[in-house]
Design a protein with these regions (language model features):
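Walker A (P-loop) phosphate-binding loop of P-loop NTPases
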Residues: 72
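P-loop NTPase switch/communication element
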Residues: 31-43, 60, 80-131, 155, ...
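P-loop NTP-binding catalytic core
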Residues: 1-61
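Hydrophobic anchor at the beta1->P-loop junction of P-loop NTPases
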Residues: 67-69
C-alpha cells in the first residue's frame, strides 16, 4: 500500500494483494491545470451569482468560514475558489495532509503533514503545523481539512487575531458540522466542558458553507448558514441562503435562494469597507411551476470576476 504525489501534483494511491483481494488497484486523483474560479462554479450550477458575490464579500471582509459536506462534494475545490478572493497583500499559510490547494497569491506558504516512517518515527501532524504557523506571522491560516485534535488549535487561531481563516470538515449538515467539531476538540486531550467548546466555536466561526452531491452527480451549495451565538447550551444557526428543491423533469431540481434574513455580521463587513446590497438577501417570488435547472439558468449570468474578484497587483 502506497500513497504518493506525481510531478504534476496528482495524487496516486496503490494497493496490491493480499490487501486488495481481487487484484491490484491504482487510483490517480488529478487536478485542473488552471484552478477553478467562481465563474466556473456558477456555470456548473454549484452556486448562484448572488450567493457567489455574498461569499466573495465574506472572504474579503475576513470572516472565518467552515466548509462542510460529505466525501466527493467539492469541499477542497470550493475552499480553493474562496481563497482566490483573499487580497494579494496578505500572508497566507496553507496546511494540508496532502497538498491540493492551488492559491495564486504572491505571499503563500504551503505546509504539508508527514506520516511516520516504517519505524513509527518522524511524524509531523496537522496539529503540529497549525501550532507552528502561529509563529510565522500569518494574516490567514487555511487548513485543508480538520479531522482530529487540530480543530481546537484552528479555533484558537481564529479567536486570536487570524481573521479570515478557513477550513473544511466532513459532515452531513451545518448542525452536524458543529457536532463533529465538538467531538474533535474533545480529542485534543483537554477536559473542556461542552458549553465552553460551543462558546469557542461560536466565537471563532462566522459562516458555514455546506455542500451536497445530487443524485445526478452535480455538486451544489445547499446552505450558507450564519452562527449567531448561544441560547442556553445551544448554538443558534440562521440560514442566509438555502437550497430549495422542486420537482421537475422526473427528478428533484432546485436552486440556492436567499431566505430573506440578513446576517448579523453585515455591520462588521461595513466597518472594513465591504458592502453587500440589500437586494442580495431578497427571497425570490413564490412560483407555481418547477424551478429552472441551475445548470441551464446560469448560462446567461454575468462574469463574477468583474463583480467580486479583488484586483491583482501588477
Amino acid at each position: 500500500m502506497v500513497d504518493a504525489r506525481l510531478p504534476d501534483g496528482s495524487r496516486v494511491n496503490a494497493i496490491v494483494p493480499p490487501l486488495a483481494i481481487h487484484g491490484s488497484v491504482l487510483t490517480i486523483r488529478k487536478f485542473a491545470r488552471d484552478p477553478y474560479t467562481m465563474d466556473d462554479l456558477v456555470g456548473f450550477g454549484t452556486v448562484t451569482p448572488k450567493a457567489g458575490q455574498f461569499l466573495a464579500a465574506c472572504v474579503r471582509g475576513k470572516l472565518n468560514v467552515l466548509i462542510s459536506g460529505g466525501t466527493g462534494t467539492g469541499k477542497t475545490t470550493n475552499l480553493n475558489v474562496l481563497s482566490s478572493f483573499i487580497p494579494d497583500g496578505e500572508r497566507i499559510i496553507t496546511i494540508e495532509d496532502a497538498a491540493e490547494l492551488q492559491l495564486q497569491q504572491p505571499h503563500v506558504i504551503n505546509l504539508e503533514a508527514r506520516p511516520p516512517n516504517a519505524e513509527g518515527a518522524g511524524e509531523v501532524r496537522i496539529r503540529d503545523l497549525v501550532r507552528n504557523s502561529l509563529r510565522m506571522r500569518p494574516d490567514r491560516i487555511i487548513v485543508g481539512e480538520v479531522r482530529g485534535a487540530e480543530a481546537l488549535d484552528m479555533l484558537q487561531a481564529m479567536n486570536t487575531g487570524h481573521e479570515g481563516s478557513m477550513t473544511t470538515v466532513h459532515a452531513n449538515s451545518p448542525r452536524d458540522a458543529l457536532s463533529r467539531l465538538e467531538t474533535m476538540v474533545l480529542m485534543s486531550g483537554y477536559d473542556l466542558p461542552v458549553r465552553a467548546i460551543r462558546e469557542q466555536i461560536t466565537s471563532a466561526l462566522n459562516l458555514i458553507m455546506h455542500l451536497d452531491r445530487m443524485p445526478d452527480g452535480r455538486r451544489v451549495v445547499t446552505a450558507l448558514t450564519e452562527l449567531q451565538g448561544m441560547e442556553g447550551d445551544t448554538i443558534l444557526l440562521q440560514d442566509i441562503f438555502k437550497y430549495r428543491t422542486m420537482p421537475g423533469d422526473g427528478r428533484l431540481d432546485g436552486e440556492l435562494v436567499a431566505t430573506g434574513l440578513r446576517p448579523k455580521f453585515l455591520d462588521r463587513l461595513a466597518e472594513v469597507g465591504v458592502e453587500i446590497p440589500a437586494k442580495a438577501f431578497r427571497p425570490p417570488a413564490p412560483t407555481n411551476g418547477a424551478a429552472t435547472p441551475a445548470r441551464l439558468r446560469t448560462a446567461k449570468v454575468p462574469k463574477m470576476s468583474t463583480l467580486a474578484r479583488p484586483e491583482r497587483a501588477r
